[in-house]
A protein has these predicted regions:
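Extreme N-terminal starter segment of soluble prokaryotic enzymes
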Residues: 1-4
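Active-site beta-alpha turn of Rossmann-fold NAD(P)-dependent dehydrogenases/reductases
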Residues: 7
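Loop-to-helix element that buttresses phosphate recognition and phosphoryl-transfer chemistry
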Residues: 10-61, 111-126
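Active-site/binding-pocket entry motifs
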Residues: 12, 101-102
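Active-site-adjacent alpha-helix immediately C-terminal to a catalytic or transition-state-stabilizing loop
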Residues: 12-13, 59, 68-70, 127-137
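Phosphate-coordination/substrate-recognition cap region in phosphate-metabolizing enzymes
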Residues: 37-100
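Short amphipathic alpha-helical segments with coiled-coil-like heptad repeat character
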Residues: 39-40, 102-104, 129-131
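A conserved pocket-lining segment of Rossmann-fold NAD(P)-dependent short-chain dehydrogenase/reductase
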Residues: 104-110
């Protein structure tokens, strides 16, 4: 089995340097163009199935790549981005400069209240692989 991983296209928050996390932000014009470019690069890949996060930026990217293919695109909550809780919408530079930055020292990152730890992210991602992808082999 081959697995292709594609990151969603750009959003206004990416452009502004704001931390998105699980906030449901759509693609901007550049993001839609990036999705179209990814679709063009992957047009010869014979996908049998596709999965994405239910977040609109991921859905629009995946829908563009899937295009007219006669395959199922399934959203799964376990593919959502890390939940940064109260930090979502914050300037990423402020988070990077902080003492508890998930970007500079992920191993010692302690999520703020209402946010998700990397262990939780890995657990739900691993659960997706175990329950959804491995049975496809």
């Amino acid at each position: 089995m081959k697995i292709y991983l594609v990151r969603h296209g750009e959003t206004d928050w990416n452009q502004a340097g704001r931390l998105q996390g699980q906030t449901d932000i759509d693609l901007d014009a550049q993001g839609f163009a990036q999705a179209a470019e990814a679709a063009e690069r992957l047009k010869e890949v014979p996908f049998e199935i596709a999965f994405c996060s239910p977040l609109i930026r991921a859905r629009h990217t995946a829908e563009t790549i899937v295009g007219e293919r006669k395959i199922t695109l399934t959203t799964d909550e376990r593919l959502r981005e890390l939940n940064f809780g109260p930090w979502e919408g914050t300037d990423v530079r402020k988070i990077r400069e902080g003492a508890n930055s998930p970007f500079t020292d992920p191993g010692s990152y302690l999520p703020p209240e209402g946010a998700e730890s990397f262990a939780q992210l890995y657990a739900r991602g691993g659960e997706f692989v175990k329950r959804v992808l491995l049975p496809l082999e």
